[in-house]
Amino acid sequence: TYFPAPTDYGEMPLIDGDSLKISSEDDRPVVFVFKTLNDPSQGRISFIKVLTGTIEPGMELVNARTRKSERMAHLYVMCGREMTEVGHAYAGDIVVVPKLAAETGDTLSVSGKIEAAAFKFPNSQYRIAIEAENRGDEEKLFTFIDRACEADPTMRIERDEETGQTIISAVGEAQVSVLLNRLEERTKVEARTVPIRIPYRETIRRVASAQGRHKKQTGGAGQFGDCYLRVEPLLDGTDYEFVDEVVGGHIPRALIPAVDKGVQETMKDGVIAGYPLTGIRVACYDGSYHPVDSNEMAFRTAARIALKKACEDADPVVLEPMENITVTIPESYAGAVMGDVSGSRGRVTGMDTNNRGETVVTATVPYAELVDYATRLRSLTRGTGDFTMEPAGYEQVPYDVQKHLVEFYEESRAQGR
């Protein structure tokens, strides 16, 4: 009595440019998943709207995205927190279906070939790392937020394997704040936000050589390893290359892999600031061994000593990740945005106007300067700006930045952190 009948809508446009006629009499139902939640009693539940036709419990429909069949075992009508089971749903009805694998925005139909236009969600531009106050609650924290992300497509959660951080992407700070409050209320897990760690790298800029010698005598069988390494920068984008140049049996062939292993172990922690070493060729060109005391452990240790010495003489530098950003803003804010890019050690690479009359600025900026860019851009443009970014490789950091990173690393080591 308050809204027009669904059949009055006529035809609904589809993604492929075709249209779908709305009718309750159609024996080929089409439904659209517009929300997904995790209910405490029912588990995963999907809110669906019947676009056309009629559905009943036990019916199987095919997901257009996954091409997999999904069975709607039960249909419920939601009223507040109460769920009432029903025997059918017609075009225009909204019902709840438990335990579907479908995600928000999916279309299900008899053929699986019909796909309604999904929602266009705002970009999740705000990124922040979170951690539980109690380390033992980390898994519970991740599980809760992962389920929250299923219900809210504007949020994403990921684990950075390199830094070990759990990172949330959201529309803004308020969304994350509400999520953490809900986490504490429902699970008693306290969590806090922390800055995102930047995945810096280290490399070298010139060729250098060094000897690594490890000798240890403890009364019984000792340890002896001796190798000469030459390091040189790789300029073709390759991360690492190991070359065996030993001749004359100065190091037995069976122990060469131990040298390689010792080198790679050292590369994980870098040589000046604690970041992984990359873009380096290492050649083992000489050494010596003891027929009794030489073993794999001794040569791994010798390789670590030699690599650190060689890299310290090879002009080591710190690299930082760069991002290509595309910022869309009203023309009146172009100057402020480009000034901010320049002040963030970035380079403006282009400026254009899109078909809506907005200014589009492209730039390359260090990732370290972009971790709070969503908040900064909102302030610069009074909430009217939008941006996207994608990785653009690594570049050497300025001298003052490297000095700060090295000093911080040395201070942390001195304090045992």
Map each language-model feature to its residues:
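Structural and coupling elements of P-loop NTPases
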Residues: 1-417
